C-alpha cells in the first residue's frame, strides 16, 4: 500500500514545479544514482523558470561537473537523458541499457537549451496497466517512473478508481 501511495503521489505531482526546498533536485540525484550508480556527484542540478509556460531544460558544463537545469523534476531528468544520449552516446531503454561510461564524464561541447513540446506528455495504455504492471514489484515501478521522467512524460495513464465507475 505504501508503494501504491508513493506512485500515486509521483504521478499526480511530477508535472508541477517545485521551488525552494530542493525536493526536485534530490529526486533527480536519486534517479541519476539508480540509472548510473556512482556518478551523481559529477552533476550539479539547478532549477530555472519555465519558458512562456512551457517546460524547459538546459545541459551545460563548468569544466568540473555536468550542469543540468530544468523547471521541474521531469525537466531535470529529461536533461539527464539528453546528456547521456548526445554527449555520452549512451542509451537507456526497457530492454537493456547501453551505459559504458568513462570514470570521468565528458563535458558537453556546448550549452544546450530545449523547450519540451506539449504541456501534457501522455504515456501508457490499459493493456500495460492491466496485463503487465499488475505484476511489477517496487524496483520495476521505480525503473518505469525513472524512464518516464527521463523521456519527459508527465501524464501517465492512471486508472485507479475507474473500476468504481464501471461497476
Positions of PLM-derived features:
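Sec-dependent N-terminal signal peptides
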Residues: 4-14
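Generic structural signal for residues in well-ordered beta-strands
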Residues: 43-47
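Short, flexible, solvent-exposed loop/turn segments with mixed acidic/basic and small polar residues
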Residues: 12, 54-61
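Feature activates predominantly on carbohydrate-active enzymes
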Residues: 23, 31, 37, 48-52, ...
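Boundary at the C-terminal end of the N-terminal hydrophobic targeting segment
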Residues: 18-22
